[in-house]
């Protein structure tokens, strides 16, 4: 103000600037009023008092929002919107930038959806804080203020500083949280927010709103989001443990009827908001149900179909299922009558829990006649099928051509939008490319099929172009249908759909009625069954990997039965990996005609996944809406030579110890050469066995050493089951085997040196001696021996202590695996950690997202 007093002519500019600096539609409105008032008065006019501009409004950095109103205290908010203590309470978090712009339709929508389902809501809005600590009042402090409370005095406001000083003391008002924020929730206060989320122990959902992709473009796109948007919309929130990235609002343009100005505002996508609200409701239901009331579906992998194929990547699935059943029983779940051993469980699963291929109708009848096998009335499935989006239905019944036909019809509703039109063309091109790629796997029909696919693509592009330019679409539609009929007459397996419900996959007839066979076993409130097969015709592998062919009716029916008839409160997929997260359509930001979303339904999904399966695990989180609970890899050990390789090593050892003058030297050399020829390893090490020399013996020995230093898994891991000390020692030894040369030596290099050996020139015999001593010393350390009693080498002692620490983390993982699963089934929060194999990320171990 002193500046204005000195330069009064700048007063109007400063007044306008204050409105702008404080932001928000109400301030912009009053800024415009002030501008008009000054202009009117300067030109001799009068300004009506009803239009007098208000003073600039400063919004607080911590507030609650509802129905267009802002509240600065929880007491004030609860006076207007009291909580029902018998119902779940959902927190909502968003930045003040959208409130300042008056663009809160997405907030209003999710509040309406949640309250319509009987849930309480506490909608928090806070300021952004860029650099940690520069803005003490912000979205993070707002969440602390409105979501936490002092158990001794619930009405007292808790500050962020108080909370951080004693996080274990405070309690929480919410059962779940919805985040509308991109990048990180809590803005600059990343670590503090991470601690808050972990302590609240509630699921945190990612409700995505886009500023770049309109609804039509999103619906028609094949990627869902731009790859650059995926980073800040999904990947960054995932690092905070935020789950289920669901696309709920898009920008929509409208023209103001008074001014003619184009207005862009967030518009909720109502069916997506409903979907999010249903999923939130089912997650918090896990908190409110007692364990005896909960129904759980355990889903394992049976590929290819048949009795001998129950498994997952490096996981002992039968033993894992038994351990999970025991844990559920101990936790009070209604589960009984299950086998006590994995062998007995396998017998039951191979009798009643397998998929049966269409070429084995006799086996299907045997399965259908088993006691307690589930036969789902095809009419009930048909009723469920009719609830699916018409695009998905058409794709199942008629195949990929029916799908692309319906997509173009959808595109006609958005053809005036440049971005939607481009998305439709891109989807057409990708569809064409994928169709031709699949057609090429059938050489006898590939050429004819490829021509027709290209013709259909061009006809559909002409439909879109004609509609966009106001021309008739009749002719290109007619061309398309002619090509479609000709294409379908080729009868290329997988391309013509699965026919009308219920199809012919795993269906039987009883007394004139059709039924779909749902393989699986029920133990009380726990259903155990195989994920259905992705494809059934001709070459199963082709359809398994297809991105254009819909899953069969029985596949959809199986998931529909689990979600709606058995009415599972949660799905638990066991091991890497299932197929539902790989089904056709969008890469991320799925819609209601994307099959992964259809199969996930609205029920919570927990996925037991190997800790090093990072890339594929992302698919299960983003497309399968799964919460991952990692499991350890099996123990890893250096490779043991066997058979002829072991004999070869012995020959080399004998040869190296034989004096050069001995007549046996040449005989041993010839024996080594013959063994190299027998094992056919000469090409691998680039030697010529017809001209075998002493130098080649050294190359063969180096090859054997390389094999012995290669890590390999030992058996399979059983989820939640502890290892022996020997197995823990093997993995700990593998972790400390990473060698950076003399400047950053591995434990094995140091031990080799202590034994008087050159680590870079170890023979196969020496390599085995070094590996054995390494594991033995670590085993002794695990069992309580002090490293100093084994060696006085400071570097070895340091690495032995490090190995002991890794062994501790490994042992912690076993109990944490099962505890994390049970916590997820209680509607809890699974803390995120970066994944990878234990060798690269020894501190990651397992049990995290």
Report residues per predicted region.
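Ligand/cofactor-recognition surfaces for anionic moieties
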Residues: 1-849
């Amino acid at each position: 103000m002193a500046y204005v007093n000195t330069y009064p002519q700048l007063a109007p500019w400063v007044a306008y600037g204050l409105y702008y600096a404080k932001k928000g539609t109400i301030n912009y409105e009053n800024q415009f009023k002030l501008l008009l008032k000054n202009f009117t008065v300067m030109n001799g006019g009068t300004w009506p008092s009803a239009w007098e501009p208000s003073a600039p409004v400063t919004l607080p950095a911590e507030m609650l929002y509802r129905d267009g109103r802002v509240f600065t205290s929880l007491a004030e908010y609860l006076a207007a919107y009291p909580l029902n203590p018998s119902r779940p309470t959902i927190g909502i978090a968003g930045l003040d930038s959208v409130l300042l712009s008056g663009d809160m339709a997405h907030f209003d929508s999710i509040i309406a959806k949640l309250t319509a389902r009987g849930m309480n809501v506490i909608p928090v809005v806070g300021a952004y804080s860029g650099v940690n600590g520069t803005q003490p009042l912000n979205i993070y402090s707002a969440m602390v203020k409105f979501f936490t409370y002092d158990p001794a005095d619930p009405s007292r406001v808790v500050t962020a500083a108080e909370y951080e000083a004693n996080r274990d003391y405070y309690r929480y008002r919410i059962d779940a949280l919805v985040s509308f924020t991109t990048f990180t929730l809590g803005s600059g206060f990343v670590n503090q927010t991470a601690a808050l989320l972990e302590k609240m122990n509630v699921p945190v959902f990612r409700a995505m709103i886009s500023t770049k992709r309109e609804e039509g473009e999103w619906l028609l796109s094949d990627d869902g989001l731009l790859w650059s948007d995926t980073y800040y919309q999904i990947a960054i929130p995932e690092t905070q443990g935020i789950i289920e990235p669901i696309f709920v609002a898009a920008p929509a343009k409208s023209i103001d009827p008074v001014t003619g100005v184009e207005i862009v505002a967030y518009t909720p996508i109502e069916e997506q908001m409903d979907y999010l609200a249903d999923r939130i409701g089912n997650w918090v239901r896990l908190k409110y149900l007692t364990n005896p009331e909960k129904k759980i579906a355990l889903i394992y992998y049976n590929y290819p179909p048949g009795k001998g194929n129950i498994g997952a990547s490096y996981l002992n699935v039968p033993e894992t299922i038994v351990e999970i059943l025991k844990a559920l029983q101990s936790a009070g779940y209604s589960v009984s009558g299950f086998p006590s051993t994995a062998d007995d469980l396998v017998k039951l699963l191979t009798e009643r829990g397998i998929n049966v291929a269409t070429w084995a109708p006799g086996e299907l009848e045997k399965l259908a006649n088993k006691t307690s096998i589930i036969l789902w009335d095809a009419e009930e499935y048909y009723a469920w099928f009719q609830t699916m989006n018409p695009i998905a239905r058409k794709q199942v019944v008629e195949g990929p051509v029916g799908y692309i036909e319906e997509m173009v019809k959808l595109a006609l509703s958005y053809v005036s939008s440049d971005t939607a039109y481009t998305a439709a063309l891109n989807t057409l091109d990708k569809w064409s490319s994928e169709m031709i790629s699949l057609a090429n796997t059938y050489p006898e029909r590939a050429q004819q099929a490829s021509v027709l696919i290209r013709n259909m693509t061009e006809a559909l592009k002409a439909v879109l172009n004609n509609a966009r330019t106001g021309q008739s679409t009749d002719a290109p539609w007619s061309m398309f249908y002619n090509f479609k009929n000709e294409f379908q007459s080729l009868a290329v397996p997988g391309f013509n759909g699965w026919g009308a419900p219920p199809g012919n996959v795993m269906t039987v007839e009883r007394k004139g009625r059709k039924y779909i066979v749902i393989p699986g076993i029920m133990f009380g409130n726990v259903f155990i069954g195989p994920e259905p097969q992705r494809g059934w015709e001709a070459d199963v592998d082709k359809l398994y990997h297809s991105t254009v062919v819909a899953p069969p009716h029985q596949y959809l029916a199986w998931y529909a039965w689990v979600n709606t008839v058995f009415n599972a409160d949660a799905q638990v997929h066991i091991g890497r990996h299932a197929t539902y997260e790989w089904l056709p359509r969008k890469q991320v930001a799925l819609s209601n005609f994307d099959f992964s979303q259809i199969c996930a339904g609205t029920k919570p999904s927990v996925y037991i996944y190997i800790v090093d399966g990072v890339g594929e695990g992302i698919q299960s989180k983003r497309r399968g809406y799964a919460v991952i609970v990692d499991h350890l890899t099996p123990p890893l050990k250096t490779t043991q030579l066997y058979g002829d390789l072991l004999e070869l090593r012995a020959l080399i050892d004998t040869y190296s110890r034989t004096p050069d003058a001995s007549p046996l030297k040449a005989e041993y050399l010839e024996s080594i050469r013959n063994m190299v020829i027998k094992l056919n390893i000469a090409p691998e090490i680039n030697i010529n066995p017809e001209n075998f020399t002493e130098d080649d013996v050294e190359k063969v020995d180096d090859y054997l050493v390389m094999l012995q230093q290669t890590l390999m898994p030992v058996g399979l891991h059983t989820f939640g089951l502890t290892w022996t000390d020997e197995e823990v020692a093997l993995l700990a030894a593998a972790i400390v085997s990473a060698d950076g040369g003399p400047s950053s030596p591995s434990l094995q290099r140091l031990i080799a040196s202590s034994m008087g050996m050159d680590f870079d020139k170890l023979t196969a015999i020496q390599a085995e001696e070094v590996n054995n001593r390494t594991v033995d010393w670590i085993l002794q350390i695990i069992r309580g021996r002090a490293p100093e009693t084994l060696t006085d080498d400071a570097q070895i002692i340091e690495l032995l202590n490090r190995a002991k620490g890794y062994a501790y983390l490994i042992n912690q993982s076993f109990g944490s695996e099962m505890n994390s699963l049970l916590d997820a089934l209680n509607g809890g929060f699974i803390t995120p950690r970066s994944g990878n194999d234990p060798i690269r990320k020894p501190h990651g171990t397992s049990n995290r997202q």
